[in-house]
From Swiss-Prot:
Function: Microtubule-based anterograde translocator for membranous organelles. Plus end-directed microtubule sliding activity in vitro. Plays a role in primary cilia formation. Plays a role in centriole cohesion and subdistal appendage organization and function. Regulates the formation of the subdistal appendage via recruitment of DCTN1 to the centriole. Also required for ciliary basal feet formation and microtubule anchoring to mother centriole.
Residue positions, PTM Phosphoserine: S689
Gene symbol of the encoding locus: Kif3a
Region feature Disordered, mapped onto this chain: 373-423, 665-701
UniProt name for this protein: Kinesin-like protein KIF3A
Amino acid sequence: MPINKSEKPESCDNVKVVVRCRPLNEREKSMCYRQAVSVDEMRGTITVHKTDSSNEPPKTFTFDTVFGPESKQLDVYNLTARPIIDSVLEGYNGTIFAYGQTGTGKTFTMEGVRAVPGLRGVIPNSFAHIFGHIAKAEGDTRFLVRVSYLEIYNEEVRDLLGKDQTQRLEVKERPDVGVYIKDLSAYVVNNADDMDRIMTLGHKNRSVGATNMNEHSSRSHAIFTITIECSEKGVDGNMHVRMGKLHLVDLAGSERQAKTGATGQRLKEATKINLSLSTLGNVISALVDGKSTHVPYRNSKLTRLLQDSLGGNSKTMMCANIGPADYNYDETISTLRYANRAKNIKNKARINEDPKDALLRQFQKEIEELKKKLEEGEEVSGSDISGSEEDDEEGELGEDGEKKKKRRDQAGKKKVSPDKMVEMQAKIDEERKALETKLDMEEEERNKARAELERREKDLLKAQQEHQSLLEKLSALEKKVIVGGVDLLAKAEEQEKLLEESNMELEERRRRAEQLRKELEEKEQERLDIEEKYTSLQEEAQGKTKKLKKVWTMLMAAKSEMADLQQEHQREIEGLLENIRQLSRELRLQMLIIDNFIPQDYQEMIENYVHWNEDIGEWQLKCVAYTGNNMRKQTPVPDKKERDPFEVDLSHVYLAYTEESLRQSLMKLERPRTSKGKARPKMGRRKRSAKPETVIDSLLQ
């Protein structure tokens, strides 16, 4: 969105990364898996232990915020999502997405259990937050809120709110708008309940399946987008519009076929999911690595749509979800490494002011025009009011005849207010009564006057209908525009209250945690100072030995980290090779079909006339409208009455020496008949030929 950079400078922020660890589920407990993850919420660290190797030191990662298994949904929302949504309400773009292995609680974090207020996720809580802010705004502030919901299934973008959820949508890009989805449906909402209903509708259409690791595994990436336009009066007295977009992303989880047991369609879905997540990892790596000159956004639909969210015009928060069980050690370490890299991505967010396509401004302009029309009245022809005064001027032509006609047309349009309509109706009724009383009026004049009254009455009725239509249109537009300060919470009021109470409690806990952290640092510093003061050589030797052990532990941890990185790199290579092998099998099958059904010459012709469409990810034929059935030659239907002079009659010719063919040929040989009205000449009768059956038998013998 174009803005004045001198007035609104860009704010450079890193992507905020938080980590949430779920508790052990019933399946993991029944199979006696051990917990390998420990969470220190005060220090913001995640420590992962390798339970089958006691010699290997644990790995520790530090993030902005971490949440343990006992964390509450409201705490997660207030600490992570609330700052992003506050920025969106100020006019920034914001993105919140959950990332991690399948079955780690990404969908629970983003959606939660909407029927229970305390278990609602980020998306439902954001509804109450947004409309709570609108309800507290000043009275002269106007808001327009729109929502859309899409999914990326097998690298196909689908509209979850559209009539046909299987229709593929195209990803487009414009310099003034950025990346957008063509023909994606968006709905205007007036309260949090509307948002919740729309989300429920879209969630029912989302692709979900069962695997060995998750009974309700998401088989697609889903993006719920909320667009908030705000119009308020500035210091200059003019109305200023700003627009913020909030993308709430629920990613499908990365999978290993050996653990999920995916086969058939589920395996194909998993391959596409892993490919898109691998591209997301490559984008993160390219953004963090200062040497990379190319960021592969276009390699996947997911990264293409998140282009602004990763390294662009957006404030972004990433929630990495992990599982605590030791059998997911490799996946947990991989997720934490990706999240640790994402911390270094820098975004340049700016307020989107005065967008050219701001829908709120268009609505306000239409409302003002409609109000003006209603105040001044509808435009009707002046002949409707003044009768037939212009009849005398018809046919007035001359050098300036055209100008006079224009003047009459302009002067003939007058404004009729609702009060004037009532007066006109009364006047028409009076004239009708007067017409009925004048019995001595000639029949022709009476019919003419009656026709004039009927015409004027129709025009008046039309004006009243247009007036009513304008009122209805104005009412519909005013319903779409939400006025600040009006109580819009209804059922969401309780949820907003819960959020505020939880936020206050979190602030108090944060203050106490900061105080305890400072005290802990002071104690550690005092301990180090005491250790430095040696009273004898023996104590000094013990101190040096202790430091040497610490350094040795750090060295072993670094070696272990390097070995893990090599193993992870090897696993990624194996996964990519498996994907390549799968794609190679599909390619060989396609080539086999092509080689057996399409001649070589036509293959070369097709290859010369196809091109790759980046927007939809397909090969397309050039000038396809002029090929194939579209240009099939229309052969004229021959007239049965006309006979081709070169056509040879072969009806009496048989093509095989069978009993049936001989019988048909002999039966067709008939004597010529005379025309009607003429007697057959009397001649000597010829000897009758033998019956066809006899001839056939003799021929066959």
